[in-house]
């Protein structure tokens, strides 16, 4: 890929709208824009300052394509670190295409996915983890995911890694110095201080690695499986949570024959609710497939909500307990919320009887929207948001997680070497490898394949 030519792309979502923004970046961005833009003030945009806005027209020869606002960002003062022009035009798809085609004829080429942010990284405007956070910020759809992406984009994660890397690099330099003076048997690196540093690095790495369990589900939404027998109100509960008729609601048992999935933000955390087919013995082939999928979805979920008809507890209480035991035995580590629906039909005596039989039960009425807030609070209780509240770094990226695991392994090798008086030259190998994995996270160590994989996930105009 050539990184020194001038690229163009639509920066706003494709399709018609009130306005669209077309972004140009490269050494010749301002010159190319000046060939198609006529300012109403008559000013030459090649002579204007950075961060200025100009009203004018995009023209193709004598043909006026649109009246636009043109923004100028020069060199290192731009997002990409090179001359950048942003053209705000009317949102007609025809106008967008005409302007982009005109710019292509004038010497631009179409940007590849994520190329504007890639150039920002290559020009030192941000490191690799910050660049990845840009994509996370764009795709964030809840407060927690937004907060994590913003912190990472502002350098919170990068600074932690950079600090660890710098301290380790200082000791690595002293170890290398010892190797240069090996014949004199001199220790430049204080072993006690080195051990303290390794313990500190190990502690931070373990904290970051542990945070991935929370960060990954926050980024992608916490999957919650709603399970139970047919016609106990699973679809009604899902619709109540989502405030819309998302699932099929019918008096006919077994009408939800497949899994239905939707998202809801509770307390700033995204939850993916999966309304599954009911669990029961059946000869219906279609429904049997749905029941099989139910157990697959339970396996994939973080939390299981088991729902039953509390008004039928007298009749089906024993069968209910058997079903609960089956889920508990098959998924012993899954957080389980037991909900008795249709509680508005119960007397006080019946309520007390059910609570005696199942102390952990939460009684609700999905139809009447009673107890739904209690359910939301229980769901939140399963998410460790302490790190969020304390503004600690939370890892959400699988690539970062993998590099952290590898770095931790190397640090533990160095610790073992220190404890067993391993020769400095052998310890130096593990230290260099740990430094490599730190650099892999921030982009100090990269290759074309890695960059290609990362930026291919971006939209074209970013």
Curated annotation (Swiss-Prot):
Intracellular or extracellular location(s): Cytoplasm
Record note on cofactor: Binds 1 potassium ion per subunit.
Pfam family, one: MnmE_helical
Record GO biological process: tRNA methylation; tRNA wobble uridine modification
Disulfide partners: none
Record-level GO cellular component terms: cytosol
Enzyme Commission identifier(s): 3.6.-.-
Matches recorded under Gene3D superfamilies: P-loop containing nucleotide triphosphate hydrolases, Probable tRNA modification gtpase trme, domain 1, tRNA modification GTPase MnmE domain 2
SUPFAM superfamilies with a match to the protein in the record: P-loop containing nucleoside triphosphate hydrolases, TrmE connector domain
Lineage: superkingdom: Bacteria
Annotated residues for binding of Mg(2+): 235, 256
UniProt binding sites for K(+): 231, 250, 252, 255
Residues annotated as binding GTP: 231-236, 250-256, 275-278
UniProt domain TrmE-type G: residue ranges: 221-384
Record keywords: Cytoplasm, GTP-binding, Hydrolase, Magnesium, Metal-binding, Nucleotide-binding, Potassium, tRNA processing
Cofactors, names only: K(+)
Subunit record text: Homodimer. Heterotetramer of two MnmE and two MnmG subunits.
Known role: Exhibits a very high intrinsic GTPase hydrolysis rate. Involved in the addition of a carboxymethylaminomethyl (cmnm) group at the wobble position (U34) of certain tRNAs, forming tRNA-cmnm(5)s(2)U34.
HAMAP family: GTPase_MnmE (MF_00379)
Record protein name field: tRNA modification GTPase MnmE
Species: Flavobacterium psychrophilum (strain ATCC 49511 / DSM 21280 / CIP 103535 / JIP02/86)
Lineage of producing organism: Bacteria, Pseudomonadati, Bacteroidota, Flavobacteriia, Flavobacteriales
Name of the encoding gene: mnmE
